[in-house]
UniProtKB/Swiss-Prot annotation:
Keywords: 2Fe-2S, Iron, Iron-sulfur, Metal-binding. Not very thermostable. This is Protein TM_1420. SUPFAM superfamilies: Thioredoxin-like. One of its GO terms (molecular function) is metal ion binding. Signal peptide: none annotated.
Amino acid sequence: MIVRVCMGSSCHLKGSYEVVRRFQELQKKYNFKLYGSLCFGNCSQGVCVEIDGRLFSRVTPENAEEILKKVLQNG
């Protein structure tokens, strides 16, 4: 699984650094690759995260694990 977190200015202002830190904590448990990314073009809905090509919006440190579980369950 590949997780890409938007590091664009809008997402940065909305907390992308904290989201990255949360995903770093979750890496050992869920075994995925984590990358920073340029803007996904959905700035008003940030923080945006792409997981295996699927875009998620309004990602927070609090809902990051729930999103990972959803992707793993639904493929």
